[in-house]
């Protein structure tokens, strides 16, 4: 079966595993998914992400993070730019998520980065997802 939106599939797998408090989730790998996992780790939304080589494209193993009392660190994930409706932001229109409490993941000409990094670098791009 052909997957039309692999980034949405990644976010849905993380969201579903987070809702049932799984320790880890495995996602088919791609370059952009590795970059998204790197950003989630840097921003403290996940504990770790590792790439596991297999005979095909590889797997990204994402270890989810929970707070004291087993409360979720990730409260929401939302795909913004979709294959049917791409969403772009200019360098002066980069969105803030929940007034800066969340994070927007943006694909720019210089790579995949957070909304804060895009504002500092004065670059715009495709708004892939919001996470809070």
From Swiss-Prot:
Record bears the keyword RNA-binding: yes
Transmembrane segments: none
Pfam families, alphabetized: Ribosomal_S8
A biological-process GO annotation: translation
Any GO MF annotation of the entry: rRNA binding
Subunit details: Part of the 30S ribosomal subunit. Contacts proteins S5 and S12.
Similarity comment text for this entry: Belongs to the universal ribosomal protein uS8 family.
Role, per record: One of the primary rRNA binding proteins, it binds directly to 16S rRNA central domain where it helps coordinate assembly of the platform of the 30S subunit.
Xref: NCBIfam families: PRK00136.1 (NF001109)
HAMAP family found in the cross-reference section: Ribosomal_uS8_B (MF_01302_B)
Protein name as annotated: Small ribosomal subunit protein uS8
Organism listed in the record: Brevibacillus brevis (strain 47 / JCM 6285 / NBRC 100599)
């Amino acid at each position: 079966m052909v997957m039309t939106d692999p980034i949405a599939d990644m976010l849905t797998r993380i969201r579903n595993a987070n809702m049932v408090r799984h320790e880890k989730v495995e996602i088919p790998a791609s370059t952009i998914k590795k970059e998204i996992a790197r950003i989630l780790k840097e921003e403290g939304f996940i504990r770790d992400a590792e790439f596991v080589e297999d005979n095909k494209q590889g797997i990204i193993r994402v270890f989810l993070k929970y707070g004291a009392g087993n409360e979720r660190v990730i409260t929401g994930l939302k795909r913004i730019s979709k294959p049917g409706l791409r969403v772009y932001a200019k360098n002066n229109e980069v969105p803030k998520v929940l007034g800066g409490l969340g994070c927007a993941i943006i694909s720019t000409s210089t790579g995949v980065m957070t909304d804060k990094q895009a504002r500092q670098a004065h670059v715009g791009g495709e708004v892939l997802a919001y996470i809070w």
